[in-house]
Curated annotation (Swiss-Prot):
Protein family membership: Belongs to the universal ribosomal protein uL1 family.
Pfam families: Ribosomal_L1
Protein name: Large ribosomal subunit protein uL1
A Gene Ontology molecular function term of the record: rRNA binding
Gene encoding the protein: rplA
Chain ranges passing through the membrane: none
Domain of life according to the entry: Bacteria
Gene3D superfamilies the UniProt entry points to: 3.30.190.20, 3.40.50.790
Tagged with keyword Ribonucleoprotein: yes
Subunit structure: Part of the 50S ribosomal subunit.
GO biological process: regulation of translation; translation
Physiological role: Binds directly to 23S rRNA. The L1 stalk is quite mobile in the ribosome, and is involved in E site tRNA release.
Keyword tags: Repressor, Ribonucleoprotein, Ribosomal protein, RNA-binding, rRNA-binding, Translation regulation, tRNA-binding
Species, as recorded: Acinetobacter baylyi (strain ATCC 33305 / BD413 / ADP1)
GO cellular component: cytosolic large ribosomal subunit
């Protein structure tokens, strides 16, 4: 049997098996774990009462987090004319049209989010095999295909959680970083959960928000009291 590292032993000692934490307790535990060699993100998983095999129960969206994510986000925008200028004014890192598509086809992918004006989709659509597998393809359901590209850039720069329910009925989202205050994480988690409730499929029956888990990149997943977040 492999020996536990010093860090693994410290983590095991810090958590209580089967405990259901308040959000503040979970943040405190994760913030006090031995530091990793890089800045860890804090991630939330929410188990939803949906059947993702049914197309009308696929929950997908984007939530602008009031306390941000703690990460610098590079944004590429497909737009031209006034829309392109507005995107630049909001701090878009890369703005283009056919030239941007050509650059991406050449392997230049130095960005985290891609936003497109509707008239640019004829160009962006040809990049599906490049952007799709990387989760970068613009989609109106998450606000990245929009005539208001400037506002989309603003939201992306502010820090957004983008999510899509997986096969197990769970959404996963980065909600901040280790070192964020409990208050900041609460703002972000409550905003995310509120948006998830708005996205509840009409055909979803029974309990919708079933379980919430908070974790750090290299740390354990801590079960959070759903009522502590949703009430």
């Amino acid at each position: 049997m492999a020996k536990l590292t010093k860090r693994q032993k410290a983590i095991a000692a810090a958590i209580e098996a089967n405990k259901v934490y308040t959000l503040e307790e979970a943040v405190q535990v994760l913030n006090n774990l031995p530091a990793a060699k890089f800045k860890e993100s804090l991630d939330v998983s929410v188990n939803l009462g949906v059947d993702p095999r049914k197309s009308d129960q696929v929950v997908r969206g984007a939530t602008t987090l009031p306390a941000g994510t703690g990460k610098t986000v590079r944004v590429a925008v497909f737009a031209q004319g006034a829309a392109a200028e507005a995107a630049k004014a909001e701090g878009a890192d890369i703005v283009g049209f056919d030239d941007l598509a050509e650059s991406i086809q050449q392997g230049n992918l130095d960005f985290d989010v891609v936003i497109a004006a509707p008239d640019a989709m004829r160009v962006v659509g040809k990049l599906g095999t490049i952007l799709g597998p990387r989760g970068l393809m613009p989609n109106p359901k998450v606000g990245t295909v929009t005539p208001d590209v400037a506002n989309a850039v603003k939201n992306a720069k502010a820090g957004q959680a983008r999510y899509r329910v997986d096969k197990a009925g769970i959404i996963h989202a980065a909600i901040g970083q280790v070192g964020f205050t409990a208050e900041a994480i609460r703002q972000n988690v409550e905003t995310l959960v509120a948006d998830l409730k708005k996205l509840k499929p009409a055909t979803s029956k029974g309990v919708y928000i079933k379980k919430i888990t908070l974790s750090s990149t290299m740390g354990p997943g801590l079960t959070v009291d759903v009522n502590n977040v949703t009430n």
